[in-house]
Regions:
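Core segments of small alpha/beta cavity-forming domains
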Residues: 52-131
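Bacterial N-terminal signal peptides
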Residues: 15-20
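Actinobacteria-biased recognition of intrinsically disordered, low-complexity terminal regions
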Residues: 1-2
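Acidic, low-complexity proline/glycine-rich segments
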Residues: 37-60
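Long amphipathic alpha-helical coiled-coil segments
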Residues: 131-138, 167-172
C-alpha cells in the first residue's frame, strides 16, 4: 500500500474485481460529465446517516456489481467506472488506509493493503453524502489504447469540499479534498479480458501515447 494517495493510486484502487470494441450499439454519443452510480444493496442508501464529531456514520451503502458492468461497450465501461468509484467511497468509510496514512493518522508500516485504519470509535469520515469522491468523464468516448483490447478515457477525480477525515482522540480534522490527486485529470487505462473490464496502472501507459482513434462500437 503506498503511503500517499496520488493520481495513480486514486484511480488505481478502482481495480478490484481487439483493436476496437466488439460491434454493439452505444447507448449515447457522449459520456462527458459526472458519473452517477445508483446500484446499492437494499435500502441503505436511503437510510445513510452522516457522521459527526460525536458519532461515526451509519448505514453506509454497499455498491452492487451487476451484469451490465461486463458489457464490452462504452456503456459497459462507463458503468464499470461508476461501480469502482462507488466502491472506493465505500472503502473510505469502511477502512481504506491510504488517506489516513498520508495525513499522519496511521503508521504505513503496519497497514497492509485494505486493512482497516482504525477502530470505528476512534476515526471516521464525516460527509453529508455517502459518495464524497466523484469522477467525471472528460471525453465524449474512450480512445483505443496502445495494445489490443485496451482503451483510454480521461477522467477528473474530485472530492466534496465539506468531507473530512476526523480523529476523535486528537480532535484533528483534515479535508478530504486536500489529498493529492483530487481536482485533477488523469488518463484511465482499461483492458477488457476474460469477459470483464479491469483498470490497468496508468504507469504502464506509454509516455509517448496520445489520443488518436476513438474506440468504435
Amino acid at each position: 500500500m503506498p503511503s500517499s494517495v496520488t493520481r495513480r493510486t486514486a484511480f488505481g484502487v478502482f481495480g478490484i474485481a481487439g483493436i476496437s470494441l466488439l460491434s454493439a450499439c452505444s447507448a449515447r454519443s457522449s459520456y462527458k460529465g459526472k458519473i452517477n452510480f445508483n446500484s446499492y444493496k437494499g435500502i441503505t442508501a436511503a437510510l445513510y446517516k452522516p457522521g459527526t464529531e460525536q458519532d461515526p456514520p451509519a448505514n453506509i451503502p454497499e455498491p452492487v456489481y451487476y451484469a451490465g458492468l461486463n458489457e464490452r461497450t462504452a456503456e459497459g465501461l462507463y458503468k464499470f467506472i461508476g461501480f469502482e468509484v462507488a466502491y472506493y467511497n465505500y472503502l473510505l468509510f469502511r477502512g481504506f488506509t491510504s488517506p489516513w496514512i498520508e495525513r499522519g493518522f496511521t503508521d504505513s508500516s503496519s497497514c497492509p493493503c485494505y486493512t482497516t485504519y482504525r477502530d470505528i470509535s476512534d476515526r471516521w469520515l464525516i460527509s453529508d453524502t455517502y459518495a464524497p469522491l466523484t469522477v467525471s468523464i472528460m471525453d465524449d468516448m474512450p480512445f483505443e489504447g496502445p495494445k489490443d483490447n485496451t482503451y483510454v478515457w480521461t477522467m477528473k477525480f474530485e472530492a466534496d469540499s465539506a468531507a473530512r477525515l476526523y480523529d476523535k482522540t486528537s480532535r484533528r480534522s483534515v479535508n478530504l479534498n486536500s489529498l493529492n490527486g483530487t481536482d485533477t485529470e488523469d488518463k484511465g487505462y482499461f483492458e477488457y479480458a476474460n469477459g470483464k473490464w479491469k483498470l490497468l496502472s496508468s504507469s504502464s501507459l506509454p509516455s509517448s501515447w496520445s489520443p488518436g482513434k476513438t474506440a468504435s462500437f
